[in-house]
A protein has these predicted regions:
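Short, active-site-adjacent segments that bind or coordinate small-molecule cofactors and metal centers
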Residues: 135-152
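Short, low-complexity, polybasic intrinsically disordered segments
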Residues: 108-109, 150-164
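Residue-level signal for inorganic ion chemistry
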Residues: 58, 89, 153
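Compact, glycine-rich, soluble single-domain proteins
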Residues: 31-83, 94-124, 129, 135
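Signal for well-folded cores of large energy- and translation-related assemblies
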Residues: 22, 63, 123, 127-131, ...
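N-terminal amphipathic/basic-hydrophobic helices that include classical n-h-c signal peptides
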Residues: 1-13
């Protein structure tokens, strides 16, 4: 592994945008589909080159991510340790590239035939690791996501940017 010495566009990779929340919900057409209390809102973008290995890595990283405060106010606890919930929402725009011009390109986003099953496997794996159901949005729908950030704490995890 080497250090990246200049900004680069990464390969088509699975990306998570994780927000620590007091609460969050997702609706479609004014109808609430899912709601959580304290926990994590996770936006998931699947890239064209993603594998089950990428999905496994991110699911494990997500549930072990220590971004909740312990008794000393130090971010030292994971979502399981605080009894938190996880809301997973698909978001292909996490795969946007803005290198050329001002209009985002989504050619790095996996097509639905690839991304939907990967998203579903990711959500199922997170539920398995948490030992509880994981609420979701509606894949491919125009959703409205409401949240109250806690901190705010927002973390970006990329499946191709792993420790060696």
């Amino acid at each position: 592994c080497g250090l990246i010495s200049k900004p680069v566009d990464l390969p088509e990779n699975m990306r998570l945008l994780i927000q620590r929340v007091k609460n969050a919900s997702v609706s479609v057409g004014g109808v609430e589909l899912s709601r959580i209390g304290q926990g994590l809102l996770v936006l998931v973008g699947v890239g064209v080159e993603d594998t089950d290995e990428d999905m496994e890595y991110l699911a494990g990283k997500l549930v072990r991510l220590r971004i909740f405060d312990d008794e000393q106010g130090v971010m030292n606890l994971d979502v399981r340790q605080v009894g938190g919930e996880v809301l997973v929402v698909s978001q292909f725009t996490l795969q946007a590239s803005t290198r050329k011009g001002n209009r985002p390109s989504y050619v790095r986003a996996a097509p639905e035939a690839v991304s939907r099953p990967m998203y579903e496997r990711f959500t199922a794996r997170v539920a398995e690791l948490l030992g509880r159901e994981v609420p979701t949005g509606e894949f491919g729908a125009d959703m409205q996501v409401a949240l109250v950030n806690d901190g705010p704490v927002t973390i970006w995890i990329d499946s191709k940017m792993r420790d060696c």
